[in-house]
Each structure stands twice: as structure tokens, then as C-alpha cells.
Amino acid sequence: PFVTYLESHPAVLPLHNRGKAGAVTENWHTDSAFLDEPPALNVLSARDVPVGGDTMWSNQYNAYERLSDGMKAMLDGMRGEFTGARLASLVGASEIPRNFHPIVRTHPETGRRSLYISKPVDTLPRFEGMTEAESVPLLNFLYQHSVQPDNVHRHHWQTGDVVMWDNRCTMHYAVHDYGDDPRDIHRVSIKGSIPR
């Protein structure tokens, strides 16, 4: 609800970062988790990229599987409040979309379980039935656990690259280390389903 797609190709979202001091995606997140049906897959096509601007992905299957049995049992059935507060504030929107989704979700095709989280406090501020103060310490643990170096892939962009990922079992982070150098990437998202 906060983005503008190309008129000529309504499924294509242009991502331009010219002249910006930072990027809204410069944090660990899963795309559009505040929607009823967040995207299943995302595809990025690098049209013009500077040196730098890498994108990193964390494997949320591994993040879940590496948890202790006690932590898995505690998280089972917990839901998080995912909000679009960060994007809403950037565009001056008065309504903030929000949804509660499982913190551990089951992939509808593979049947595997993964951690389903996003980093910024204004994107996933709390667990259902808990306050932010109660939720943040556990969320911080889950974030740190998820992004251990051996659980992260870092892609060094080159013009012409096309990368696709499964938004249901990864988090990603766009590194903004290229100043105001031109960066032009197109994104297409494939419709997902309600997380379960």
C-alpha cells in the first residue's frame, strides 16, 4: 500500500536510492509481513548498481532448527504483531496496517518450519498477549541467533544480476554503503498465502 509500481509493467516495483542517506531496507526483515498474505517469493533485477550495496539473506530454516528443544516448545503457537509502521511514517500515511502471524511458520510446500521475524521494533514490536518490554529481549535473541555469520549469504551485485528468494523462510538486509551513487533495481513479488 506504500509503493508505486511502473505504469508500463504494474507488477514491477522500481527501487531507486539516488541521493538517499540510507535505505528503509537497511535492517534484517522479511518483506511485507504486515499483509494478510505476505509475498511468497521476491525477484530482484539489477539494472544499474554501484560498487557496494550488497544484499544479505539469513536462512530461517536453519535458525529454527538450531534452537534448543525448550525454545522451540516455547515459541510453538506464539504469534507476533507485524506492522507497516516504518513504511507508513515514510509516506505520511495515517493508517498503519498490522497483522498477527506465527513466529514459527510451516512452509506450505516443503512442510519445513522456520523462524518468521523482522528486526525493527516498529515492524515486529511484540508478541501477541505480551507488552513490548516483555517481547523485545526474546526478539533480540532470535534476531542475533538468526544472523550468525555461518547462517548468512552475502550477494555482491553486478549489473544484470537476477536474484530470487523465498520470503517465507529468509530474512534479508540491503547494505547502504554506496553514498548517493546511482542504484536502480527492479523488484517483482509473487503472491503468498496466510502464514501458518
Feature names for model-found ranges:
Residues 1-162, 167-196:
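Non-heme Fe(II) oxygenase catalytic core, chiefly the N-lobe of the double-stranded beta-helix
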